[in-house]
Swiss-Prot record:
UniProt organism field: Bacillus cereus (strain ATCC 14579 / DSM 31 / CCUG 7414 / JCM 2152 / NBRC 15305 / NCIMB 9373 / NCTC 2599 / NRRL B-3711)
Annotated Mg(2+) 2 binding sites: 257, 259
Binding site for ATP: 123-178
Location of the protein in the cell: Cytoplasm
Higher taxonomy: Bacteria, Bacillati, Bacillota, Bacilli, Bacillales
Family: Belongs to the D-alanine--D-alanine ligase family.
Protein name per Swiss-Prot or TrEMBL: D-alanine--D-alanine ligase A
C-alpha cells in the first residue's frame, strides 16, 4: 500500500490528504508504506515492490496523468482515473472544449499561451469581471477575479509564473455546488457558501470561512445537475471517483472543473458527501481501493 505526498503547488494539501488516509485505513487489511515524492525521479526509485498505489496527490504531476502513466509503465495498479482521463481533466481548456461538444454548460473562456496573444476584442465579448486561472492546477491555486484590464494584466503576469497556459473565464455569480461521483454513482450534492468572494485555496481549507452542507435541490434543477455531472464523468472517461464543481445560475448548472483526485482532508467535500450517503471515511477508502483494483484489472493490470 502506497501513500503519496507530492511536489507541486498543492503539496500541503497532498500531505493533509495522506495523513487523513493513514489515520483511517484499516491496519488489519493494509500494509501502509507512506512515501513522499520530492522530485519526479523519486517515483521510479521508491515504487519498487509496491502492490498498489493509493494516490494522495493533487495538482500538476500528481493529477495530470504523469504519475498515472509512470505507474502504468511500471505495472503498478493505482487509485482513481487513468492517465488519459487525468490529463484531460487537468487541462481546463481541453476539458471545457469536450464539455461544450457534449452540450454541457461551462463559462465562456479564452486561453493564452503568452501575453502578446491577449485580444481586447475577445475580452470585451466576455465582459468584466473575469476569472483568471492556470490552465493546469487545482485547489483554486493561482485563481483570482479581476474587474478591469489593469487588474487582468497584473494577474496574468502572476499566473504565467504558475503555468505556461492561462485560462480567462467569464465570471458566473450563482450558487456554488459540488457533485461527487463514486464508481459511476452520484453521492449527495453539497452546497458551498463562503465569506470570501471566491472559493479560493484559503477558503477551501479554512473551516471558519465556509459553510458546506448537503442540500436537496428543486427537482428540475437536480435533474439538470445530475445529468451534467454524469455527462462530465463519462465524456472525460473518469473512473473510480471524481468531483464535479458547478455554479448554478438561473436554474442552469455551469461546470467549472472536474477533479479526478479530489481532496480527502477533514474539510474536503467528497468525504462529506459520502458521509451523507452513510459511507464512513474508512469505508470510502475501502471502496476506492477495491474499485480501483477492479478497474485496473479491466485495463490489463
Amino acid at each position: 500500500m502506497l501513500l503519496w505526498a507530492g511536489y507541486a503547488s498543492e503539496k500541503q494539501v497532498s500531505i493533509m490528504t495522506g495523513n487523513e488516509m493513514i489515520a483511517h485505513l484499516d491496519k488489519n487489511k493494509y500494509e501502509i508504506v507512506p512515501i513522499t515524492l520530492n522530485e519526479k525521479m523519486d517515483l521510479i526509485e521508491k515504487a519498487k515492490d509496491i502492490d498498489f498505489a493509493l494516490l494522495a496527490l493533487h495538482g500538476k504531476y500528481g493529477e495530470d496523468g504523469t504519475v498515472q502513466g509512470t505507474l502504468e509503465s511500471l505495472g503498478i495498479p493505482y487509485s482513481g482515473s487513468n492517465m488519459l482521463s487525468s490529463s484531460i481533466c487537468m487541462d481546463k481548456n481541453i476539458s471545457k472544449k469536450i464539455l461544450r461538444y457534449e452540450g454541457v454548460e461551462t463559462p465562456d473562456w479564452i486561453e493564452l499561451t503568452k501575453m502578446e496573444d491577449l485580444n481586447l476584442d475577445e475580452l470585451d465579448k466576455l465582459g468584466f469581471p473575469l476569472v483568471v486561472k492556470p490552465n493546469s492546477g487545482g485547489s483554486s491555486v493561482g485563481v483570482k477575479i479581476v474587474y478591469n484590464k489593469n487588474e487582468l494584466i497584473s494577474m496574468l503576469e502572476t499566473v504565467f509564473e504558475w503555468d505556461s497556459e492561462v485560462v480567462i473565464e467569464k465570471y458566473i455569480k450563482g450558487d456554488e455546488i459540488t457533485c461527487s461521483i463514486l464508481d459511476g454513482k452520484q453521492l449527495p450534492i453539497v452546497s458551498i457558501r463562503h465569506a470570501a468572494e471566491f472559493f479560493d485555496y484559503n477558503a477551501k481549507y479554512d473551516d471558519t470561512s465556509t459553510v458546506e452542507e448537503v442540500i436537496e435541490l428543486p427537482a428540475q434543477i437536480k435533474e439538470r445537475v445530475n445529468k451534467a455531472s454524469l455527462t462530465c464523468y463519462k465524456a472525460l472517461k473518469c473512473s473510480v471517483y471524481a468531483r464535479v464543481d458547478m455554479m448554478v445560475k438561473d436554474g442552469i448548472p455551469y461546470v467549472m472543473e472536474i477533479n479526478t483526485l479530489p481532496g480527502m482532508t477533514q474539510s474536503s467535500l467528497l468525504p462529506k458527501s459520502a458521509e451523507a450517503a452513510g459511507i464512513s471515511y474508512s469505508k470510502l477508502l475501502d471502496m476506492i481501493i477495491e474499485t480501483s483494483l477492479k478497474v485496473r484489472n479491466e485495463e490489463g493490470f
